[in-house]
A protein has these predicted regions:
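Absolute protein N-terminus
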Residues: 1-2, 18-20
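Bacterial N-terminal signal peptides
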Residues: 2-14
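Exported/periplasmic ABC-transporter solute-binding proteins
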Residues: 19-56, 60-64, 75-85, 92-97, ...
Length: 250
């Protein structure tokens, strides 16, 4: 019995080893991390204080003093933070995703298989939802340029409904509520709403692929715990969960 107690003591993390990890995480990774973080906490005894937001909104929050041991955001933002000396060099790529097209579940599914087909579908829609540029979205500027590329910017302007961000301000909510007939957003975010159906992806000519990465901040208080978290999130065992949430291997 004494030997068993010793073995169990070695296997179970001690309170002294437990850490509170502050993590800033892009919304595109929320559905996946909602599943990945709890098992990590149970296995290691750590607590994750996760704070989510659009990629472009996370950095201002960090610069304003919000604590962060680890950043999970788009690779371009991580690279910029490394240049500024705010993140430790050597990012770990976790997954990638692209912009999907979605409608309310049960609604007619227009053809969006080519740039011309998408153009006609957008022109036929009464309203369209995408993220608000002012909210820090990295997809919004690309979508607006795409409208220009398709030659429909003027026609789309009065139809656009902007998602401000947050739990009730997502593109998927605009679609599921009926406020937007069709929506454009990173597919991992669209798939998180069961009342929304993804009907396709932007074609290669129009697509924007974003790689999401993780890195430890230079002012991290829990460096080793943050490294352990990144290792867990990039493990092969995490790949099926990313895939199920609309995220592919990097």
């Amino acid at each position: 019995m004494r030997m068993l107690a010793v073995i169990l003591a070695l296997l179970v993390p001690s309170v002294a080893d437990a850490a509170e990890i502050n993590a800033l995480i892009s919304t595109a990774l929320k559905a996946a991390t909602d599943e990945l973080l709890p098992p990590f906490e149970r296995a290691h005894g750590h607590t994750i204080r996760a704070s989510y937001g659009p990629s472009g909104a996370l950095i201002p929050r960090f610069n304003a003093g919000q604590p962060a041991d680890v950043f999970l955001t788009d690779s371009a933002a991580i690279d910029e933070l490394i240049k500024e000396g705010k993140v430790v060099p050597g990012r770990t790529d976790l997954a990638r995703t692209g912009i999907g097209i979605a409608v309310r579940k049960g609604a007619p599914k227009p053809d969006v298989s080519s740039p011309e087909a998408l153009k006609q579908a957008l022109l036929a829609a009464r309203s369209l939802g995408h993220a608000a540029p002012a909210g820090g979205s990295i997809t919004a500027p690309h979508i607006m340029r795409m409208f220009e590329q398709l030659g429909i910017a003027a026609e789309m302007a009065p139809k656009v409904r902007l998602a401000a961000g947050g739990p009730n301000g997502r593109v998927s909510v605009l679609i599921s509520s009926g406020e937007a007939d069709i929506g454009l957003q990173q597919v991992s975010e669209l798939m998180s709403n069961p009342d929304v159906e993804v009907i396709g992806m932007l074609s290669a000519e129009l697509q924007q692929i974003t790689i999401y990465s993780a890195a430890v901040t230079t002012n991290a208080r829990e460096v080793e715990a943050a490294k352990t978290l990144i290792k867990a999130l990039s493990a092969p065992s995490a790949a099926p969960i990313y895939k199920a949430k609309g995220l592919d291997p990097p």
